[in-house]
Amino acid sequence: MPKNATIHTSSGFMGNPVALTHCKPKEIIVRKRFSGSTIMVAIAAAAGSVVISAPTTTASAQAPAASGTTPAPAPSLKTAWGEPDLQGIWTDETATPLQRPARFANQEFFTEAERAELDRMRSEVLGRERRAERGTERDVSGSYNNVFVSFKRTGARTSLIADPPNGRIPPLTPEAQKIAGAEREFRLALLQSTETCKNKEAACSGGKYDPTHSPRFAELPPRYSTARMNRNDGPEDSSLPERCLTGGLPEFGGPTGSFRRIVQTPGGISIFYDVGQGQGWQRNIVMNASPHLPANIRQWYGDSRGRWEGNTLVIDVTNFSPKTDFQGSRENLHLVERWTRTGPSTLEYEVTVEDPTVWARPWTVKEEFARQSDQDNRLYTEPRCVEGNYGLPGIIHGRRMEERAFAEGRGPDPATRDAMKDGFIFDDEPLR
């Protein structure tokens, strides 16, 4: 291998893995495939994972108190080897948008009336017993009835972003704007002959309708594609979520789940992320004070190096693969995470996001997680993604069938049909 060769790995760690397995829901549910949707829903049954790890409490703390005796002491917030104990299954129990919606400007907290109204608005979409736009492709693409899906109550804060004070992602650098503009222009060109642009829907914002499909259909994307496009020539035209490659950092939850299982051993920490739809992934944090990997070694989840600052776990993450994509940031993404146990059932997470090639300044997100029951999450299975294993060949085969039908005069030109299924929105992120 050449000395300066770049190595890309899909593993979240370098070294010996810690076995982690995915948790089945407590109840039987139907998980909807959201294909880029920004609506955040909470599955009614908790989900997580299980591992075999060192105990964190003494036998006396675990045993129930006998009648008439002094109650057993509360579990310690330290591990058996003396480190702050962050272990358990954790989730955020309320819905908070990443960015503050423009209509709430510099308002840091919702009023109770605003929270109630936002809950009402989401309840009209999720949990309903009717389907919208019957007979349309959009209806077929969202074939699960929303009655099977629940939603989380609106949180008190108007954004997860705590800094800048306006709760918004900082402006892009001029170079990042240029790159984003080129990608957007390419995807809009592939949409121009669809009903989406003809009807001037939000997904075509900034584009225009033209009944003839764009000659750019024959072009490669401006750079490695991570988002959905209106073309299915091959697997590379499908988005990362469609290919079950959504796992990545930072992770702020998604449409079908936001659970973390933290496991500690002397000298090591692993975090398993359950993101719903049968998908999950893990990362291992190196705790031996060693430096980051060489710059030519790149990993999907980056290279995590942790240390303790008092009761806070501080993790520095670098060495991301250029094939990942977080808000336009790829190989230059740098994260500093802070995990702090704030009580027996509460955990605070803070992450500062930095990429000087993408944003004008660093920005910080804060989240609060609640401890979930290990007993209720005792059934487990390996995470898997049916869409990634079986759906993609069907999507590509279906496109070839549509093309043959069009050539034989039996159907419309596939280029005039929006295959993106609502997955392309440019305006403010709605409340999830």
Per-segment meaning from a language model:
Residues 27, 31-43, 47-432:
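PEST-like low-complexity, intrinsically disordered acidic/proline/serine-rich tracts
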Residues 10-29:
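Short, Lys/Arg-enriched N-terminal segments with co-localized hydrophobic residues
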